[in-house]
Amino acid sequence: STSLILDNTLFPSSTLSGPYSVVKLLIKGFSLDSKIGTKEQWQRLLNDLNKCDKDINMVFDKYHIDERIIDNLCLAVSGLEYRNWLVFLYFKFNVNQIQNSYLKLVVDETLNFEDFKTNLMVKITEISHKDRCFRRLYDERKKLVKDFPEEDIAIFVKANEIDPIESIYRLTDNTLLEKKAVIKWITRNGFSEAISEIYPALDAYLKRYIFDCPVLARELTEYFDFYKRQKVENRISDDFIKLVEKYASSISYAQLPTRDNAIKAIADKNKAYLYWIDALGVEYLSYITALAKEKGLSIHTDIVRSDLPTITSVNKQFYEQWAGGKKYKEEQLDNIKHKDKGGYFFTDDEDPIHIPEELEVIEKA
């Protein structure tokens, strides 16, 4: 029974009714509110305490719950089972020992288990990016939720839309969903200094790439800097249209060497690996350069042109006739940009939300 009634005692006594009251009596210094658990949960905890020498830490040990639980937090809090609730109870009971500031904030301010996972997702939306603690909370939350599935992150993305001025600062590059949200924000609000912090890959893509080829270096630098920003913003300015018409009428691109000539210039093809990313253009050079630098690699770039029309069927002889033994063709970028199987349809969403997946293809390559 979970009720203890003592009649005719020699000393003052009180009545304990319900499992929570008994749990509170058994655990020294237990001050958690009864509302954080149901009667059934408290009863099961009481049963466990009676089997574990009335020691709550032994109960946590029984279910393999300790400070390492934070490393697999998604699994630990996803569900409504008794152990999931015990994880929440563990955090509430040990709140002062929590090292992750964001988790500590969420645990402190969450009153019941049912709201715990949602609060992990959305608590950051209540904090201004100007708050002196924001950056630390942002970074610690990012690590904390990195393994949560997109269906959980979607709750955060939706809640984060309420304040457009603040929302960009809270997004991360943990998931494709958030990366797309960054793109959508830019199409509506323009560029923000926050992009370099929240989405470094996009920032690297947008960096101005300085061409140093023998011909058209200035023109290519100007054109592709202009082009990339408009691609992300999903708009075309009149000035850019004039620039396109100017270059198209002058046929200045014909001054560049052909791709086939660049391939032929490789002296020892047996020591080279031909890696063809179909639909890869010079717009990605700033991003590719950043990736190479990050990996400690050196990079040499020759700027060339393909034959017109630029469809793959007309521009693949360099690959088919490659004299070296090692080659590979990556088609996913072309699928994303040009084909239905890439999964992006302008009729479904006019925003350029395909850009994050384009960058992911290049990163994996």
What are these regions (language model features)?
Residues 1-272, 279-365:
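…; additionally, a secondary subgroup of soluble metalloenzymes is captured
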